[in-house]
C-alpha cells in the first residue's frame, strides 16, 4: 500500500511542473492577478476532503485575510490555526505564481488533534469544515480569555461573559455566523413564540431537478405540529396544535450551504448518495428571511464549491472549484486547471440514473457583496 502510494506520488510530481506552466500560459501574464497564487495541495492518501475545503476557504477572501493576519501576531504554541496560517502564508508568499505545496504540517496536526481524521479512510468534507471552523473559534476565544487574564487587553465584557457564558464573537463568527429564528404559532390562541439560534453553515435537504432557492424554501416550509408532536403553549398552558417554521434572521457575510446528499437507506443498511440535479446560481438572494431580518435584500456571489465525486460517502473523491477575480479554477489535489463559468453546470448533479457516479456540488460558499 505504502509503496503504491509512493510510486503514485512520484508519478504525480512529474506532471506538476507541466500542469503549472500550462495554467500560467492559459491565464496569460497580462491577465494574471497581482499578488495571487494558485497552488495545488499534495494528497496524503485520503486527504482530498481536507484539500478541497482548504482551497475553498483560501478563496473566501475575508477568511484568508484573517488567517494571514493571525500569522503576523506574536508566535503562539502550535495548534490547528497556527498550522493553517503557516500553510496560507506559504501559499501567499511563494515566488512562483503556480505550483504545488504539501500541507503536511497541517494534516499531521489535524490527525493528532482528532482521531476521526487519523486514518486512511475517506472522510466527510462537511464534517471537516464544521470541525475546522469551530476549532478555530475555540482557539481564538481561549486566547482572548488568556489575554484578559494576563491584563494584555482591557477587561471589556469579561464580567458579562462570565455571567452569560457567551464569549465574545470571533472573526470566524463575524464571517460565517448567521442567525435562524424558529417561529411557532399556536393554532388555538394564535400566540407566536420565537427562539433564535446561530449557525456557521446551513444544511438543506435536496430533491430531484430543483434549485438552491427551492431547497431554501423547503428549509423554511411551515410544519404542522399535531398528534403526539403537539406544542406546549405557555398561554394556553396545555399542548396544542401549532405551525412551526425556520427563517433566517441575520444573514452572514459568507453563507456556507451544505447539500444533504447522503441519506441512510434502511433497506440497504447504509448511507447512499443522492446525486439529484440541484442548480446553484452564480448570484443568490435569500427569500426565506424573517420580517425583522437585518439586510434581507443582501445579494451573494458564488465564490467556491466543494464537489463530491462518486456514489457514496465512504468512497469517491473531493475537488474544489473557486472563483478568483474574474475566472474560475478547478483544484483537484495537486492539479489546478482554469475552467469556463459554463462548466459549473456539470456539477449540478444527475437528471436520471442517480445511482451512477456523479460529480455534484456538496458545499457552496456564497459571499455577500456588502
UniProtKB/Swiss-Prot annotation:
The lineage of its organism: Eukaryota, Metazoa, Chordata, Craniata, Vertebrata. This is Ubiquitin carboxyl-terminal hydrolase 12-B. PROSITE patterns: USP_1 (PS00972), USP_2 (PS00973), USP_3 (PS50235). The active site is at residues 48, 317. GO terms for cellular component: cytoplasm; cytosol; nucleus; plasma membrane. It catalyses: Thiol-dependent hydrolysis of ester, thioester, amide, peptide and isopeptide bonds formed by the C-terminal Gly of ubiquitin (a 76-residue protein attached to proteins as an intracellular targeting signal). InterPro entries: Papain-like_cys_pep_sf, Peptidase_C19, Peptidase_C19_UCH, USP_CS, USP_dom. The keyword Cell membrane does not apply. Residues 39-369 form the USP domain. Residues 155-165 have a biased composition (Low complexity). Residues 145-168 are annotated as: Disordered. Belongs to the peptidase C19 family. USP12/USP46 subfamily. Deubiquitinating enzyme. Has almost no deubiquitinating activity by itself and requires the interaction with wdr48 to have a high activity. CDD domains: Peptidase_C19G (cd02663). The gene is usp12-b. Keywords: Hydrolase, Metal-binding, Protease, Thiol protease, Ubl conjugation pathway, Zinc. It comes from the Eukaryota. It is an enzyme of class 3 (hydrolase).
